[in-house]
């Protein structure tokens, strides 16, 4: 890694989860002569873990760890190295995301070493690589003025019909993208690191309250349910119906007013009973699901890694924010209260317990009886996102009439 970054000032560590990306990047910074101030950008929940690694390594340079959402709070200049954790989150296309623009600006103003970290550099499309690196001088795509010119050479652009309009699809990136990145990348797998762990998954079926099932049936039939003047559940499009059923089958709902409510704590009650005496990590999808867990678990539940690691409390994390950059090595089991539509979320979140010394991991999925979760699961285990197309195919019931959506 030191040879690559000394030569090119840029290194991409494509290392699988739990193989030591953080310590490797901090160690590389220690070996570079001209590095005194390092900026480490990550997700908020990973900050404490990275600071612990820094203290353990005890290098000669100063380290500032910050989350992407707080980049506006730090000095724009004075950094000798910038490390971007979970770099694939910079990869939105065709337009660059706000965070990709912010990182580009920081790199430009500091002319510094850059290290990108990710266990999944291009989780959904090779095209995601461009905006991860476009702000780094000397990157392999610097000859292209923008993403569209990059696509002229590296992407097979197609047309997709969406809502009656022909939209250009830039997701079919070519193998040439990864070929171009090879000289900047170091890849390292769990197998290479000596991991021999396995993950066993078990699906647990949870009966929901009768009123919850009836509410779902009413919504599929009528596409609107008015509980009170203020509490209206509207599902007048396919996307809305998919989202509302996803919420309801796990016992929560977000009303048209923007307010949310817990209508059924069956899943939370089941978790408390099933895993009594065990220390667990719980992943939830919707914010109201955390409210349901708090109602049932009370003070026995925390939401930060530091408390989880130092007490006997369980931890609850939202799937998207907790799937990357953290380790739940102290959990006996991981329990999914709900499931995300994203295949990336599935593959990353289920791996949070894995360590080199741990040979066996058990992950539990809670699916409501008759709910939508098992249908989503079938898609994501095949590395496919669950989309409206899947939903319309799956929910063909007498109450649901797709022609109305």
What does each model-found stretch correspond to?
Residues 1-4:
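Pre-Walker A adenine-sensing motif
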Residues 85-86:
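Walker B catalytic acidic pair
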Residues 341-350, 354-405:
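A conserved SF2-helicase RecA2
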Residues 43, 57-73:
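Inter-Walker segment of RecA-like/P-loop motor cores
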Residues 6-10, 16-20, 24-36, 196-329, ...:
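Conserved Helicase C-terminal RecA-like lobe
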Residues 19-27, 34-54, 123-128, 286-287:
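Conserved Walker A/P-loop ATP-binding site and its immediately adjacent core
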Residues 81, 99-190, 358:
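Conserved P-loop NTPase motor "coupling/switch" region that bridges the ATPase
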Residues 15, 22, 71-76, 118, ...:
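SF2 helicase motor core recognition
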């Amino acid at each position: 890694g030191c040879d690559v970054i000394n030569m090119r000032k840029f290194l991409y560590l494509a290392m699988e989860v739990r193989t030591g990306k953080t310590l490797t990047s901090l160690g590389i910074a220690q070996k570079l002569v001209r590095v005194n101030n390092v900026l480490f950008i990550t997700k908020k929940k990973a900050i404490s873990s990275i600071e612990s690694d820094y203290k353990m390594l005890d290098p000669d340079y100063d380290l500032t760890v910050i989350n992407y959402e707080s980049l506006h709070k730090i000095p724009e200049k004075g950094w000798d190295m910038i490390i971007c954790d979970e770099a694939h989150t910079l990869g939105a296309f065709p337009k660059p995301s706000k965070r990709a623009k912010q990182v580009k600006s920081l790199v430009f103003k500091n002319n510094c070493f850059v290290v990108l970290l990710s266990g999944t550099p291009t989780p959904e499309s090779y095209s995601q690589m461009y905006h991860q690196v476009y702000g780094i001088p000397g990157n392999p795509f610097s000859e292209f003025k923008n993403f569209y010119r990059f696509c002229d050479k590296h992407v097979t652009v197609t047309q997709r019909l969406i809502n009656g309009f022909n939209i250009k699809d830039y997701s079919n990136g070519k193998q040439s993208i990864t070929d171009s990145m090879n000289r900047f990348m170091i890849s390292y797998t769990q197998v290479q690191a000596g991991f021999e762990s396995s993950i066993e998954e078990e699906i647990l079926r949870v009966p929901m309250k009768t009123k919850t099932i009836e509410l779902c049936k009413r919504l599929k039939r009528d596409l609107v349910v008015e509980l009170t003047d203020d509490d209206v559940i509207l599902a007048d499009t396919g996307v809305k119906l998919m989202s509302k059923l996803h919420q309801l089958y796990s016992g929560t709902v977000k009303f048209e007013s923007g307010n949310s409510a817990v209508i059924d704590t069956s899943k939370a009650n089941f978790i408390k009973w099933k895993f009594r005496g065990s220390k667990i990590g719980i992943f939830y999808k919707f914010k109201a699901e955390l409210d349901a867990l708090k109602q049932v678990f009370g003070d026995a539940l925390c939401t930060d890694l530091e408390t989880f690691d130092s007490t006997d409390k369980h931890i609850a994390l939202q799937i998207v924010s907790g799937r990357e950059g953290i380790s739940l090595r102290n959990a006996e089991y991981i329990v999914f209260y709900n499931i995300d539509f994203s295949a990336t979320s599935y593959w990353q979140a289920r791996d949070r317990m894995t360590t080199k010394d741990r040979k066996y991991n058990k992950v539990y999925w809670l699916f409501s009886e008759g709910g939508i979760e098992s249908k989503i699961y079938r898609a994501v285990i095949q590395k496919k996102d669950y989309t409206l197309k899947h939903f319309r195919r799956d929910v063909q019931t007498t109450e649901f009439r797709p022609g109305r959506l």
